[in-house]
């Protein structure tokens, strides 16, 4: 009689789609890895067995044999390639830990399945298979019965998500869990797109589980996941992350910072960063940020405090009735949550004076004001029982709207808000997108909004709202609103994914500009662009530290008080420093936005000195990379005098160079400190150099580094310039710039200071 049979189904796992930047660089990929497991109960060589009269089998481990097998397996697991066994350091902690894991697993002689290692590459897996095959063959023929038997070691295929650039763009990309399911970021919001559909193979098997030879198997192929091609550009992202990190370190920013570069017309996000962040390859690890996170949770007890409790769960208080922080509490959950958050969309902040751009648009578009409308600022202004002041209690006198934005006059904007009125103010506030989420294609955008509706906007609420100190919004909401104010008046939906492709690269779906509505007229938008450019000026306006020579830039700073937070140790409110810049100012393509939450710079709280320089530095590299239109002035042949930057803080030194049309580079050294003062520069102060020359700055040495001059003869002028730049040298071209290099001012191989000017003669 034929044994009974049944259908068995074996899954075929789909390969998760990849994530690419705008130029096709891989940001997230999937590789095949293997779980190595063993069946000790079937590994007869690891033990001796005795059967009692009642049929009970007793197994006794052979420690020596178990140790031998464990050693061989461990060497292969740690070799990396399955071959370099001699290179494995058997005295290392890694070896000892892996060896103990294998030995303990193999010692479980009654177990049918024990895991020896996970995420093993194919080369190591093959090496282990070869070892097991050879071992079993040799011991099958052994004449010594104590050496006769077999080991049962097998492998299971799985997939591993890889992020080749580590923490790069981590808050945007997110990560997957142990099962390969998107848990945060794009990995989560596009889970179904990336995951694909698993397949399966159905076979008939007999009663003992063996496949029936003459039965046909039915296979349903897996459908691999689709790929995401982002609007995010790795070069722009790198620039943004670098300068944001510098700013956080230089200004002792307590509660992280965020930066965004976005196309104002389409909403395409070119860069989005939140720092400090995490490595999505190991998202549970917060050790790299431990000191920072420890300081943060203790500096923000109203947000993260874990307080001491008695045995009944009641909070313990000191003699003054204050709760007592539990210094021994486990903050790991907070640590991970903080570093995972995309600060641009998950947290609210008071925008401060950046919001004056929006109030200006309200006044102009409603017909209640224009750029020449005047109000008088006496330095203080009473509303109901509240008295408002401008920064430093300064009286600006009678000023126009354009001048009020440049001077960031609170008193002017309170009066403008009063003229606009509660209902009109709220209607525009709503139209600019502040009462709803932006709709960005990222998860965890906060649903919580903090603002006053029209019937809640009393005198005081309206006054505070007019200069951005009564509503809490997200940084991305502020970005999209400013974009609408300058792009002709259109509120667009921001997005990170540009298109979706299949596994063969064919485009399945493209994401274009999604205009939600027109908020203001084109003429109003034109007026806003004018007054924002007036704010930055040619390095002379209130936002002058965001100016980069050669570009028309509009901007606005915002220094807001965190009224909902505990005060600082000096008794003042914690601050948020932010700056939004658009360029080119006459027809903006991008917005560059930076926000620093609770900076603790000993010299200033003003965002014009804290956030504006970061924006300027980002623009100094991003604008030429993206090919943003310049101001049209021909500066070729222009000579610039290098300023004296020694003794100047790194961030301030950068600003001075940006304004003069010179580039800056922090010279590489082991202890470079961006928060420190410049100790050495080259070219030196007073040197006459060409417009666009790079000045190399040092913060930890009084001597410049040297570099070797490359041989550029015979190269095109452009290629020669690139070679010299890569070597840390400046270049001046003489002769026919379309020709090839005939001579160079320094011999190839010569050792010169970084930043030296090499003149090449072309013909």
Protein language model annotation of sequence segments:
Residues 6, 11-15, 198, 252-256, ...:
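Short, small/polar residue-rich loop motifs at catalytic or cofactor-binding pockets
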Residues 511, 547-550, 564, 594-763:
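Ligand-recognition elements built from short beta-strands and adjacent flexible loops
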Residues 5-8, 38-62, 110-119, 173-177, ...:
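Second-shell loop/turn segments in exported
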């Amino acid at each position: 009689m034929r044994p009974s049979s049944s259908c068995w189904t074996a899954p075929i796992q789909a390969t998760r789609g990849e994530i690419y930047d705008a130029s096709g660089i891989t940001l997230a990929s999937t590789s095949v890895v293997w779980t190595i497991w063993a069946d000790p109960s079937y590994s007869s060589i690891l033990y001796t067995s005795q059967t009692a009269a009642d049929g009970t089998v007793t197994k006794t481990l052979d420690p020596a044999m178990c140790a031998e097998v464990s050693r061989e397996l461990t060497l292969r697991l740690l070799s990396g390639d399955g071959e370099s066994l001699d290179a494995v350091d058997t005295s290392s902690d890694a070896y000892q830990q892996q060896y103990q894991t294998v030995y303990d697993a193999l010692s479980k002689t009654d177990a049918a399945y024990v895991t020896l290692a996970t995420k093993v590459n194919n080369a190591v897996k093959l090496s282990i298979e070869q070892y097991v095959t050879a071992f079993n063959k040799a011991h099958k023929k052994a004449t010594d019965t104590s050496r006769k038997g077999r080991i049962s070691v097998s492998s299971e295929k799985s997939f591993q998500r890889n992020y080749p650039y580590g923490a790069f763009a981590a808050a945007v990309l997110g990560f997957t869990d142990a099962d390969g399911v998107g848990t945060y970021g794009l990995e989560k919001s596009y889970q179904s797109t990336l995951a694909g559909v698993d397949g399966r193979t159905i076979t008939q098997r007999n009663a003992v589980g063996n496949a029936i030879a003459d039965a046909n198997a039915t296979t349903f192929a897996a459908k691999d996941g689709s790929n995401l091609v982002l609007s995010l550009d790795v070069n722009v992202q790198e620039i943004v992350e670098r300068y944001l990190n510098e700013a956080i370190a230089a200004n002792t920013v307590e509660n992280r910072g965020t930066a965004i570069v976005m196309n104002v017309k389409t909403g395409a996000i070119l860069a989005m960063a939140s720092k400090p962040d995490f490595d999505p390859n190991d998202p549970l690890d917060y050790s790299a940020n431990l000191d920072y996170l420890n300081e943060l949770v203790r500096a923000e007890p109203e947000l993260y405090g874990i307080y001491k409790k008695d045995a009944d769960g009641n909070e313990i208080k000191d003699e003054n009735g204050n709760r007592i922080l539990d210094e021994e509490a486990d903050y790991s959950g907070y640590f991970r949550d903080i570093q995972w958050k995309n600060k641009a969309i998950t947290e609210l902040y008071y925008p401060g004076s950046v919001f004056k751009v929006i109030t200006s648009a309200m006044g102009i578009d409603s017909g209640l004001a224009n750029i020449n409308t005047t109000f008088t600022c006496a330095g203080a202004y009473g509303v109901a029982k509240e008295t408002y002041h401008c920064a430093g209690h300064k009286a600006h006198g009678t000023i126009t709207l354009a001048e009020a934005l440049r001077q960031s006059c609170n008193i002017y904007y309170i009066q403008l808000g009063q003229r606009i009125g509660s209902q009109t103010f709220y209607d525009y506030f709503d139209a600019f997108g502040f009462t709803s989420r932006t709709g960005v294609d990222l998860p965890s955008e906060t649903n919580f909004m903090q603002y006053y509706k029209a019937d809640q906007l009393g005198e005081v609420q309206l006054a505070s709202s007019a200069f951005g100190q009564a509503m809490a919004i997200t940084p991305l909401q502020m970005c999209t609103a400013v974009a609408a104010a300058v792009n002709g008046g259109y509120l667009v939906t921001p997005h990170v994914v540009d298109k979706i492709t299949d596994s063969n690269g064919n485009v399945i779906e493209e994401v274009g500009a999604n205009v939600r509505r027109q908020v203001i007229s084109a003429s109003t938008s034109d007026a806003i662009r004018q007054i924002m450019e007036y704010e930055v000026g040619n390095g002379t306006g209130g936002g002058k530290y965001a100016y980069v020579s050669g570009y028309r830039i509009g901007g606005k700073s915002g220094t807001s008080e965190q009224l909902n937070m505990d005060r600082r140790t000096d008794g003042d409110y914690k601050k948020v420093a932010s700056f939004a810049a658009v360029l080119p100012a006459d027809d903006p393509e991008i917005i560059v936005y930076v926000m620093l939450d609770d900076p603790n710079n000993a010299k200033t709280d003003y965002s014009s000195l804290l956030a504006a320089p970061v924006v300027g530095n980002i623009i100094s590299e991003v604008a030429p990379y993206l090919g943003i239109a310049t101001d049209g002035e021909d500066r070729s042949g222009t000579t610039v005098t290098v300023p004296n930057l020694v003794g100047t803080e790194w961030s301030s030194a950068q600003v001075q160079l940006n304004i003069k049309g010179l580039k800056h580079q922090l010279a590489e050294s082991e202890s470079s400190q961006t928060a420190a003062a410049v100790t050495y520069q080259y070219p030196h102060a007073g040197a006459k150099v060409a417009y666009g020359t790079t000045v190399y700055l040092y913060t930890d040495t009084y001597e410049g580094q040297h570099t070797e001059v490359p041989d550029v003869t015979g190269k095109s002028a452009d290629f020669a310039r690139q070679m010299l730049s890569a070597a840390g040298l400046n270049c001046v071209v003489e002769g026919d710039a379309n020709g090839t290099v005939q001579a160079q001012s320094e011999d190839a191989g010569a050792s010169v200071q970084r930043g030296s000017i090499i003149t090449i003669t072309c013909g």
